[in-house]
Structures are given as structure tokens and as C-alpha cells.
């Protein structure tokens, strides 16, 4: 006999309901994965348990990308079909979707920091790992780019400082060379002045009068031809010699 049709109604037994939810959830996630792989389709599956626990599945692309695509599509469809001139009606329709999106973003944020990972299946953990790996690669690429830019900027500053240092050193050398030339010229002029003053003819010595035996002063005349001075004929004789002469 064939299998009878199962009547769809709420399972009253709590334990049976939890077991059925776990089995059907696993089968639903499996079917979503199969259709994603076999048909190359973007699939997003969101399931909330009776306790409010979230279970989800997304294909290789992230859940946020699929939801954004769905929102754009649904928004364009509503704009084409909506005839309500009151925008508040649209706001009331968008509020539940925005609330659901906020919850998804908050949950993904917790997953990215390593929290609330128990409800995730192996496939979901693999998707999360791939997303984190991709994010880390982008972060490392950006970090390396910034480091290379910083190193290049420092090299440019170093080159500029070296050029400035060389220019200052050149100016200092030129200034020292000018000072050396000025000092050499000054010393040369000083030596020339000292040598010229060494050849000046000294003045003749002053001739002083000489004292004779008789007590009279007789000056010495210097003749123009360079002859020696002669004694003066007006030399006085003592009285005792005069007496003998008169005799």
C-alpha cells in the first residue's frame, strides 16, 4: 500500500515538534543547497524557530547581496504596481523588511566576531569562513598598499633632506674658501708693510760737546768730507806753565 497523505497541522507534542523541526530544517537546507549547485542559482533561506533562533542558508554570494538584490527588485515592482498616492502606506510596508534586515545584519555582525555560532551548520560555517578569508585578504592588501605609500613618502622626504644637506654643505665650503682667500690677502699685505718699514735709514747720532782738561767745552765739528775732528787751538794753559814761558 502507498503511503497515506500526512495531515498538515501543528504538532502538539513539544518534543515531537522540535524533532520534526530539526529534521525538516536540515532537509530544507539540503534542498536549498542542491538547487543552488545544480541550477547555479542564488538562494537565500531564512528560518526562525519557535524560540526565535535564526537559521539561514545562502549560496556562494553573501546573504546581504541577495537581500539587497531582492529589495531592489521588490521596490521596482512596487513602484510599477502601486497606485496609492499616500507615501505613508509604503513606509508601513517597508518597516517589517527593514526590521528583518537589521536583525540579519546584527546577527551577521555577531558571527563575524565569533559569537552565536552554535546554530550554524557546517555549510554556513564554511561560508562564514570564506567571507572572513576574503575580508582578511582585502585588509592585508589595503594595509600593504598603505605601508608602501608610507615608505615611498619617507624615501622622498629622505631624498629631499639629503639634497638640502648637500646644498648647505656646498655653501659652507664656499664661505670657508672666501674667508681663507681674504685671510691670505690680509697676511700678504701685512708682510709687505713690515718689510718696507725695515729699510728706513736711521737718523745720525747726536754730537755732544766734550770736556777738556782746563774745564772749557770744545765742540766737535764734523767735516763734510768725513775727516776726523781736530782739537781746538784755543786751549788754555795753566798759570805755572805761563810763568816758565815768560822767563
UniProtKB/Swiss-Prot annotation:
Region: Disordered, residue numbers: 224-247
Molecular function GO labels: DNA-binding transcription factor activity, RNA polymerase II-specific; protein dimerization activity; RNA polymerase II cis-regulatory region sequence-specific DNA binding
PANTHER family in the record: SERUM RESPONSE FACTOR HOMOLOG
Q: Which organism is it from?
A: Vitis vinifera
Instruction: Name all K-box domain ranges.
Output: 88-178
Q: Which Pfam families match?
A: K-box (PF01486), SRF-TF (PF00319)
Mind listing the GO biological process terms from this record? flower development; positive regulation of transcription by RNA polymerase II; regulation of transcription by RNA polymerase II
Q: Which gene encodes it?
A: FULL
GO CC terms:
nucleus
List the SUPFAM superfamilies.
SRF-like
PROSITE patterns named among the record's database cross-references: K_BOX, MADS_BOX_1, MADS_BOX_2
**Which parts of the sequence belong to the MADS-box domain?**
1-61
Role, per record: Probable transcription factor involved in flower development.
Q: In which tissues is it expressed?
A: Expressed in tendrils and flowers.
| Protein name per its UniProtKB record | Agamous-like MADS-box protein FUL-L
Keywords of this entry? DNA-binding, Flowering, Nucleus, Transcription, Transcription regulation
Please tell me where this protein is predominantly located.
nucleus
User: Which InterPro entries does the record associate with it?
Assistant: MADS-box/MEF2_TF, MEF2-like_N, TF_Kbox, TF_MADSbox, TF_MADSbox_sf
SMART domains from the UniProt entry: MADS (SM00432)
Where, subcellularly, is it found? Nucleus
